[in-house]
A protein has these predicted regions:
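Alpha-helix/helix-capping structural signal
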Residues: 16, 118-120, 162
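Intrinsically disordered, glycine/charged-rich C-terminal tails and inter-domain linkers
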Residues: 148-204
Length: 204
């Protein structure tokens, strides 16, 4: 059966610090905190995008480009999702009722976004949908990048050139960075600091 190629936005919202958080803390409380934060991301980001699946510490979403007529809507979604995530994480920490390592380590968690625009195919097997394609592979490869190494940021949004071009967003407020991957070559990306945007939204 031939599957139709679709074009649209691909978005990955990935909790930074997840691996060390789980490895160094009590798994029961870590699971509760992470589930709560993942639910927060899904609820917010799912208001505009279709959630494809949860990938451990990440939420993978997609949306046909026609469903987002203005690029600023996607940028606002990233802002609002990050705002909600940070607020909920701080609330969790403030209301923690124990001194376990998991509760103490909540402030080490952060959120990064990878945004791309490209082609994908929706595969359905036994009622389970999955996205396939080179651009799907690319966005997942981009989650392993040099942003934190180059900037010190752990909460950020990384957009590919294709993503920003489709959004028609001014690139002046972003830091340009090139990533390179085997079989995919060099990828032009643009990054913004979500901590700074969070402070701006909070009026700090």
């Amino acid at each position: 059966m031939e599957r139709k190629t679709q074009t649209g936005y691909l978005v990955l919202a990935d909790i930074s610090g997840y691996t060390s958080f789980v490895a160094k803390t009590e798994i029961e409380h870590a699971d509760i905190a992470l589930s709560y934060l993942l639910e927060t991301i899904v609820e917010k980001i799912g208001s505009l995008l279709t959630v494809s699946k949860l990938e451990g510490d990440a939420v993978f979403c997609y949306c046909a480009a026609d469903n987002i007529p203005e690029g600023k809507s996607l940028l606002e979604l990233v802002d609002q999702t990050y705002l909600e995530f940070r607020d909920k994480a701080q609330d969790l920490y403030a209301h923690a009722t124990c001194d376990c390592k998991a509760c103490k380590a909540i402030p080490t968690l952060d959120l990064k976004f990878i945004v791309h625009h490209g082609d994908f195919i929706i595969q359905q097997v036994a009622g389970i949908k999955d996205l396939l394609g080179t651009d799907v592979n690319l966005i997942h490869r981009l989650s392993k990048n040099h942003v934190a190494e180059a900037t010190g940021w752990h909460g950020y949004a990384l957009f590919t050139n294709q993503g920003l071009e489709k959004m028609q967003t001014d690139k002046k407020s972003f830091i340009q960075q090139t990533e390179a991957y085997e079989h995919l070559g060099e990828v032009e990306t643009y990054v913004m600091n979500m901590h700074a945007r969070y402070d701006g939204m909070k009026g700090v």
